[in-house]
Amino acid sequence: MTRKIRCALIGPGNIGTDLLAKLMRSPVLEPVWMVGIDPDSDGLKRARELGLKTTAEGVDGLLPHVQADAVQIAFDATSAYVHAENSRKLNALGVLMIDLTPAAIGPYCVPPVNLMDHIGSGEMNVNMVTCGGQATIPMVRAVSRVQPVAYGEIVATVSSRSVGPGTRKNIDEFTRTTAAAVAQVGGAKDGKAIIVINPADPPLIMRDTVHCLTETAPDEARIVESVHAMIADVQRYVPGYRLVNGPVFDGNRVSIYLEVEGLGDYLPKYAGNLDIMTAAAARTAEMFAEELLAGRLALQPAAQAA
């Protein structure tokens, strides 16, 4: 049997449970622990049924088992408010943290844009921005790699049913972190992010709108080509990522309209916001796992982790 890198998941909510389904299919990652705080949570129950070890004592319930169970990568799908402490405790044991909260204490990772930049940099914490960021930043980058973008604005519309209590508590962090990453990763000089939580029933599929203001008149042909190439890159790990309309050109404004259909691993297919976040996190962790398995990466305990 091929050796796999063992992982722990923190937070058995919508995102953590959807991520677990993806990790169960991974050729290089083996989920062994699910960490929560409510012993009666559906996510912990599902994890136990799938053969994972579980604790309802939070990260402190996992720490004594990290070395015995050879956990090397942890995914935090809890809240920005507790992530820094979770990361500090696990980094101190040499565990690499993939952050699915908007805490953003580590560098941003949007796989089709900057995944390979994280190889060999020695970081012990990478941040997956937000679901809105994962869906829209590739499009901002698709424009900015053609010509300078003065301003990028994204609007992510998601179904109320797909947004759990952790995400709801982090709305301000969501908008700040996404806007910062639109600039830092997307390449816009200034960024803004808006999230709309839609209570419609039946639930609507995730929809995203991206507006970019270019500094000079848009090179329409090259932007169209760049956008389609980037969409193909995202579809490699999120097959339900689709261009609905655009790029639409109006003066220096370039507008791109997207929808994201999920695989239906945990919530139904309308919850593409879960899918794009968890698929990006799994893709990022697999890259690190491949480096670990090949002997090109060694994780060091971080004495003074963030």
From Swiss-Prot:
GO molecular function: acetaldehyde dehydrogenase (acetylating) activity; NAD binding
Active site: C131
Recorded catalytic activity of this chain's protein: acetaldehyde + NAD(+) + CoA = acetyl-CoA + NADH + H(+)
Record bears the keyword Oxidoreductase: yes
Keyword Coiled coil: no
The EC number(s) this enzyme carries: 1.2.1.10
InterPro entries given in the database record: Acetaldehyde_dehydrogenase (IPR003361), Acetylaldehyde_DH_C (IPR015426), NAD(P)-bd_dom_sf (IPR036291), Semialdehyde_DH_NAD-bd (IPR000534)
The organism's place on the tree of life at top rank: Bacteria
SMART domains assigned to the protein according to its UniProt record, in alphabetical order: Semialdhyde_dh
GO biological process: catabolic process
Protein keywords: Aromatic hydrocarbons catabolism, NAD, Oxidoreductase
Binding site for NAD(+): S162, V163, G164, P165, G166, T167, R168, K169, N170, N273
Entry's family note: Belongs to the acetaldehyde dehydrogenase family.
Protein name, as recorded: Acetaldehyde dehydrogenase 3
Annotated organism of origin: Burkholderia lata (strain ATCC 17760 / DSM 23089 / LMG 22485 / NCIMB 9086 / R18194 / 383)
Classification lineage: Bacteria, Pseudomonadati, Pseudomonadota, Betaproteobacteria, Burkholderiales
